[in-house]
Structures are given as C-alpha cells and as structure tokens.
Amino acid sequence: MGSNKPLGKKVRLAKALKQNRRVPLFVIVKTRGRVRFHPKMRYWRRKKLKA
C-alpha cells in the first residue's frame, strides 16, 4: 500500500491496529486465567480489512 492515504482510511487503519492487541496481562491475572485471548484478534495474512 502506498504511503499517501486519505485521512479517513488512515484513521480506520489506526483504529484496527489499536484493536488488534492481546489481552493485557493484568486482565489475565485479575480473571485468574479465564480470559486469555479475545476472539477478534486478526492476523494480517488470513483476514483482510474492509477499510
């Protein structure tokens, strides 16, 4: 993808990047390991964004 992007697309890509993080360690500890992963994790090669 080129480096020149419209602002709207850039904002959507940034949001998707922020959402694609693992569950924080303090949450895993707080829930005693019940919450280990979140199902909306996206791997860049498998699932493509509609951005």
Curated annotation (Swiss-Prot):
UniProtKB keywords: Ribonucleoprotein, Ribosomal protein
Oxidoreductase keyword on record: no
SUPFAM superfamilies, sorted: Ribosomal protein L39e (SSF48662)
Membrane-crossing segments per the record: none
GO CC terms: cytosolic large ribosomal subunit
Matching PROSITE patterns: RIBOSOMAL_L39E (PS00051)
GO MF assignments: structural constituent of ribosome
Any one of the GO BP annotations: translation
Entry-linked InterPro entries: Ribosomal_eL39, Ribosomal_eL39_CS, Ribosomal_eL39_dom_sf
Pfam families noted in UniProt: Ribosomal_L39 (PF00832)
HAMAP family, per database record: Ribosomal_eL39
Protein family according to the UniProt entry: Belongs to the eukaryotic ribosomal protein eL39 family.
Protein name per Swiss-Prot or TrEMBL: Large ribosomal subunit protein eL39
Organism: Methanocaldococcus jannaschii (strain ATCC 43067 / DSM 2661 / JAL-1 / JCM 10045 / NBRC 100440)
